[in-house]
Amino acid sequence: MGTVPDPLRSAKTSLIAASGKEDDLGEPQAASPRHRPALLCKNANGFSGAPAEPDLSPRAAAEALMQVCEHETTQPDMSSPGVFNEVQKAPATFNSPGNPQLPGSSQPAASAPSSAAGRDLIHTPLTMPANQHTCQSIPGDQPNAITSSMPEDSLMRSQRTSNREQPEKPSCPVGGVLSSSKDQVSCEFPSPETIQGTVQTPVTAARVVSHSSSPVGGPEGERQGAICDSEMRSCKPLTRESGCSENKQPSVTASGPQGTTSVTPQPTPLTSEPSACPPGPEKVPLPAQRQMSRFKEASTMTNQAESEIKEVPSRAWQDAEVQAVASVESRSVSTSPSILTAFLKESRAPEHFEQEQLRVICHSSGSHTLELSDSTLAPQESSQCPGIMPQVHIQAAAAESTAFQRENKLASLPGGVLKTSSINLVSSNAQHTCKEDGRLAGMTPVREESTAKKLAGTNSSSLKATAIDQISISACSQAETSYGLGKFETRPSEFAEKTTNGHKTDPDCKLSDSCGSISKADHSGSLDPTNKGDAREKKPASPQVVKEKESTGTDTSDAKTLLLNPKSQESGGTESAANPTPSPIRKNQESTLEENRQTKTATSLSLPSDPMGDSSPGSGKKTPSRSVKASPRRPSRVSEFLKEQKLNVTAAAAQVGLTPGDKKKQLGADSKLQLKQSKRVRDVVWDEQGMTWEVYGASLDAESLGIAIQNHLQRQIREHEKLIKTQNSQTRRSISSDTSSNKKLRGRQHSVFQSMLQNFRRPNCCVRPAPSSVLD
């Protein structure tokens, strides 16, 4: 057991990667041997990990899977009887527990075919899985239609054809991988289930184990096929739930690894699979649509909870490392108020404008935020730059970051997108759409709109479901969104909405995110060029969406340079405003996001200030925006201090710095007046509270009044300190004199007493002996 998971995992990873490539290449056969171990690994993981099926012993499952994996890896044809024997042993263990799962007739049928086969290998347990496998392979087709008697070659061919067909089906991303390998199918079948996390995984694993066993006799095979059909029917809802009905079908072929004996049953499922595959794709889209409907429902639910979800992504943005990064200028400005004066005029107007944009961005990102800030950022970023994307996604979610890495690769390679989508059930639609987008960047907006609607549902749903399936679903939807470059644009209506909300707003969101969450360099750096390139490439798709993306690309590029031209931002903001999502919702989202950001003191200052700065053409303006926000607070503080009569010299200086340029001219006169007024104020009689109404109500500049008050307070403090010092010195002197006199007196008293004792004459008995006598 200990050794089984590691090789399986390694094989799984390599096989999964290979399977994705093979699926994209349309070479499932070559990939099949690789995928088989991967699927087996998944099965082993599913068995051991699937608590739902206590009947299956994890050890037996792992051992069988290991054996099958070894057999598959060593023998893609699965002809070696030794391997079959090993597999039979493991499946035997599985079958005993797994039999309750399998139809009762499947075991006798399996045993009968094994006896009929009369092969050295004991396939009884394997035949059990073979029946199940045939059931799986025949979602719509009856397994009995294909008999195990079919020659291995024809079966293999049918398997290949079915496998080829399956990879073509985008709805079978997992299935594609599964179908790529004849034997893989059984292994992979559980793998999609394992991905789905349904109990089916162990069941399918047991079935696969039984399926991989000996070929079923023609009539027995038919019986088993019928049983399997019932099983598949029962499993179909699960597969549909998992959204991988096709994947399960390909998984049926997994029996191949068990050997030619199992291959015969495999061809049965496989041959049935080719026939089943054509309906399978139809069925697959149905489950995908169902999933989409589920996701849409989930999305509606998430939309209902948008405010909460938006808050979470906004928090994530605020938590992003980018927030921690503060431009030196902003810090210097915050520390030195004199610098603020130059920026105040420029930055204040941009603040309102940028705040609106940020709100729009926040809103769009918020609406997209339902999917997650990652999803909004992911579509652009994932499509734009895989390297940067993982970082941003890592901030949001590690799983999503991995998915985004894949998506980034996919964004660069439509095949890659298909791979990731193949992994995801939703990705089946994403694959089609991605393929269409990759092949036809300028596909008619209607098509892509329909696909965009599906993908939009899948994206929002998958992104919303990202918490559970972040890697798989988010990879699909985000791969879609990353292809969303084409898809979003080609989907002018919905993805124009989502892209405007999510993608286009993503540029805005990138501004807000760059301001608040994801590293601006990441957004602008990798995402911007990709956005620009993607937008340019996909301009034919839909000029409106392309324009939006271009604006987003320009915005992101501006964010990159931190020189966001107000024009580009305005265009982005206007476009985002033009986005189908209602402005009131955005406003609500913006308000919520802004509130969330503002609630966070330091981060809120930096975050809103960043978006503010972003709208301003210069990166330096970002710092002014922050400083500007800080500056208004300072004046409020100064006013409070003035009211409280507790002005600090720094506060007064800050006020002077905060005063607009017009006041600078007055500063000279003010300083003179301050001197005069301060002199006058000093002469004023101060009441208990520190100042009389004459002084408090006098028409004095804040600076002069503050200075006068400070001078008065300082004088009082000095006087008080002098008094304290004098008192302390007096008390110390008295204490020192007392202590010294006491010590002296005590010493004297002691010495007098001792002298009296010494001088007192004692009787001879009590006379102190001489010291020498003691020594003697």
UniProtKB/Swiss-Prot annotation:
Entry keyword annotation includes rRNA-binding: no
Biased composition (Basic and acidic residues): 520-552
Superkingdom of the organism of origin: Eukaryota
Keyword Phosphoprotein: yes
Pfam name, any one: GRIN_C
Phosphoserine: residues bearing it: S332, S365
Keywords: Phosphoprotein
GO cellular component, one term: synapse
GO biological process, one term: locomotory behavior
Positions with biased composition (Polar residues): 129-161, 193-203, 242-274, 566-580, 725-742
InterPro entries: GPRIN2-like/GPRIN3, GRIN_C
Comp. bias (Low complexity): 101-118, 208-217, 604-620
Disordered: annotated span: 1-37, 68-312, 518-637, 723-748
PANTHER family: G PROTEIN-REGULATED INDUCER OF NEURITE OUTGROWTH 3, G PROTEIN-REGULATED INDUCER OF NEURITE OUTGROWTH C-TERMINAL DOMAIN-CONTAINING PROTEIN
Described purpose of this protein according to its UniProt entry: May be involved in neurite outgrowth.
Name of the protein: G protein-regulated inducer of neurite outgrowth 3
Organism encoding this protein: Homo sapiens
Lineage: Eukaryota, Metazoa, Chordata, Craniata, Vertebrata
